[in-house]
Amino acid sequence: MSHQPLSCLTEKEDSPTESTGNGPPYLAHPNLDTFTPEELLQQMKELLTENHQLKEAMKLNNQAMKGRFEELSAWTEKQKEERQFFEIQSKEAKERLMALSHENEKLKEELGKLKGKSERSSEDPTDDSRLPRAEAEQEKDQLRTQVVRLQAEKADLLGIVSELQLKLNSSGSSEDSFVEIRMAEGEAEGSVKEIKHSPGPTRTVSTSRALSKYRSRSAEGAKNYLEHEELTVSQLLLCLREGNQKVERLEIALKEAKERVSDFEKKASNRSEIETQTEGSTEKENDEEKGLETVGSEVEALNLQVTSLFKELQEAHTKLSEAELMKKRLQEKSKLTVLQMTHNKLLREHNNALKTIEELTRKESEKVDRAVLKELSEKLELAEQALASKQLQMDEMKQTIAKQEEDLETMTVLRAQMEVYCSDFHAERAAREKIHEQKEQLALQLAVLLKENDAFEDGGRQSLMEMQSRHGARTSGADQQAYLVQRGAEDRDWRQQRNIPIHSCPKCGEVLPDIDTLQIHVMDCII
C-alpha cells in the first residue's frame, strides 16, 4: 500500500504560456502575423529559383567533369596503345637488324673463306698442266658465262643501291604525310573557328564533333604515314633478300668453278707425270703445251675477275647495309618528330577546346531555357497551392491553440481545486489513521479488560456456586443461574458489537470493510 502524497502535481505545475505542442521546447513557432502572404510568396519563389539554379549548376558541373574525365581517360589509353605499338615496332626493327647483321657476318666469313681458297688456287702451279684443248675451251666458255652473270647481277645490285640512295635523299613520303597532317590541322582550326562563332546551345555538340573529326583525321594521317613507311621497309627487305639469294648463287657457282679448276689441275698433273715418263716430244705436244699455257693464263684472268667481282659485291653489301641503317634512323627520327608535333598540337587543341567548353558552360548556365521557365511556373503554382493549404492549416492550428489556452486556464483552476481536495484528503486520512490506531489500542485494552472481566466473572460464579452449594436451596440457585446465563449472553453480544469496526465514506456514507478499500473509494469519490 502506497501512502505517497499527490504534491507532485503542484511541484510539476506548468504555466499556461509554456509549450503546448509535441515538439521540443526550444523550437518556437514563427510569428507569421508579421509577414504578409505576398511577401511569403516572393520568398518562396526566390528560394525555389535559387534551389533550381543550384541544382542546374551542379548538374552542369558534374557533366563537364565526367566529360573531361572520359576524354582524359581515352587520351591516356590512346597514348598507351601508341607507346606499345611503337615499342613493338622498335623491337621488331631491332630483331630484323640483328638478323641482318648476323647474315652479313656470315656472308663476310664465307667471302673471306672463298678469297683464301681463290688465293691458294692462284698460288698453285699451273704451268705444268697439260689438258686437251676441247675441255679447256669448254671450261673457258663456262667461266665466261659465269663472269657475264656476275656482271649482270652486279649491275642489278648497283641499280638497287642507287634506288635506295635516291629514296633516302628524296623526302616525298614525309612531305606527303606532313601535308596530310597540315590539312587536318587546317580543318581542325576552321572547325574551332566555326564553333567559336556558332550560337550557345550548339557549341558543345560542334566542339565534340570537331574534336572527334580532328582526332580521326590525325589518326588516319599517322596510320597512312606508318603504312607507307612499312611498305618501303618491306620493299627494302625484299631487295636485301634477293641480293642475299644472288650472292648465295654466285658463291655456289664459284665453288663449282673452283672444283672444276682443281679437277683440271689434277688431270694436268697426272698427264704431266705420264708424259715425263715417256720420252720424245713432237710439234703437236709443243702446240698443246702452248694451248695449255694460254688456258692457264685465261683461268688466272678469270680468277682475278671473280675476286674483283667479290670485292664489288662486298662493297655493294656494305653500301646496302649503310643505306638501310641511314633509312631506319631517318624513319625513326621522322616518326619521333611527327609524333612530337602531333602530340603538342593535340595538347594545345585539347586545352583550347577545354577553355571553349568552359566558356560555353558558363554562358549556358547564365541562360535559362523555356523548358526551365515552364518547370518554374509549374513549381510556383504548386508552391502557391501548398502555401494556401498551409495557410488553412495555420488558421486551424491557431483556433486549436486558442481552445487549448482556454482549456489551460480551466486546468489551472481545476488543479488548484485538486490541491485543496488533496490537502483535505491527506489531513482526513492522517486523522483517520490516528483514530484507527487509537481504536486498535482501545480494542486491545478492551480485550484485556474483557479477559480480566471473564476471569473475575468465572471466579465469582464459582464462588457463588460454592456458596449456593453450601448455603442456598436448589430453586433459588436455578433462578440465579438462569439470570447469570442471560447476563453472560448479553455481555457477549455487546463484545461482538464493540469488536466490529465501522468504515464509511465521509462524502457519500458508503460502508466499506477495510481501510485500504475506503482510501481508494475516497480518492475516486473526491476527485
Swiss-Prot record:
* Pfam families assigned: CC2-LZ, NEMO, zf_C2H2_10
Q: Where is this motif: UBAN?
A: 424-429
* UniProt keyword Cytoplasm present: yes
Post-translational modification Phosphoserine, affected residues: S177, S198, S476
**Residue spans of biased composition, Basic and acidic residues class:** 186-197, 262-274, 281-292
Q: Which GO terms describe its molecular function?
A: K63-linked polyubiquitin modification-dependent protein binding; zinc ion binding
The entry's keywords = Autophagy, Coiled coil, Cytoplasm, Cytoplasmic vesicle, Endosome, Golgi apparatus, Metal-binding, Phosphoprotein, Zinc, Zinc-finger
Major localisation: cytoplasm
Sites binding Zn(2+) sit at: C505, C508, H521, C525
Per the record, the GO terms for biological process are: autophagy; cellular response to unfolded protein; Golgi ribbon formation; protein localization to Golgi apparatus; regulation of canonical NF-kappaB signal transduction
Matching InterPro entries: CC2-LZ_dom (IPR032419), NEMO_N (IPR021063), NEMO_ZF (IPR034735), Optineurin/NFkB_EssMod (IPR051301)
Region annotation Disordered: where it falls in the sequence: 1-32, 101-143, 186-214, 262-292
Protein's UniProt keywords contain Zinc-finger: yes
PTM field:
Phosphorylated by TBK1, leading to restrict bacterial proliferation in case of infection.
- Coiled-coil stretches are 38-170, 239-458
Record's comment describing the protein's domains: Ubiquitin-binding motif (UBAN) is essential for its inhibitory function, subcellular localization and interaction with TBK1.
- What is this protein's record name? Optineurin
Per the record, the gene is OPTN
